[in-house]
């Protein structure tokens, strides 16, 4: 059974059977409860794992450890911006729709969010970002588009520009990787 999500007039589908709450057995019900949003829903990006609750649980654990870890010092609006840019690079309208909606809310400045979105759509973050933020976006771009070309120097350069400790560095690498994994799981 496919699911459809409107995104700018287009529809995205995944031809993966998804189990609804009322059909779920106990193990899946427990994992659904872990995955519930503050509104009480289970996002489709999680529900596509419903045939294999263990993968849904793994996705939830990875997601929460990256985004909600107390050592993550990256502002939430920028986390959503990174996710949006990776979604653009991967042509994933589903992921983009979700992350950009959150980014707009967190940025809370229509002029700024419009300028950011325009630059990201053109794949030119340098039009609105500089310094650490631009370095993160460029790193995420290379990791997303050309992972086999990543070199130790890429990591060291970003660490030098941005962070003093590995503890602060971990979220960026994990975040970019988790977004890519999420999008791979949607295929």
PLM region descriptions:
Residues 2-187:
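Hydrophobic alpha-helical segments
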């Amino acid at each position: 059974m496919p699911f459809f999500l409107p995104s700018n007039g287009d529809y995205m589908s995944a031809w993966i059977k998804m189990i609804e709450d009322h059909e779920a057995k106990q193990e899946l019900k427990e994992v659904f409860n872990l995955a519930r949003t503050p509104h009480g829903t289970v996002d489709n990006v999680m529900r596509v794992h419903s045939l294999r609750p263990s993968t849904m649980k793994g996705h939830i654990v990875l997601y929460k450890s990256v985004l909600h870890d107390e050592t993550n010092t990256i502002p939430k609006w920028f986390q959503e911006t990174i996710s949006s840019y990776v979604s653009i690079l991967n042509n994933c309208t589903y992921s983009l729709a979700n992350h950009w909606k959150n980014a707009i809310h967190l940025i809370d400045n229509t002029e700024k969010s419009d300028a950011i979105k325009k630059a990201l759509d053109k794949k030119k973050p340098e039009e609105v970002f500089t310094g650490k933020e631009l370095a993160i976006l460029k790193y995420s771009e290379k990791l997303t588009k050309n992972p086999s070309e990543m070199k130790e120097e890429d990591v060291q350069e970003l660490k030098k520009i941005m962070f003093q400790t590995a503890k602060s560095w971990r979220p960026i690498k994990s975040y970019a990787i988790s977004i890519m994994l999420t999008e791979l799981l949607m295929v």
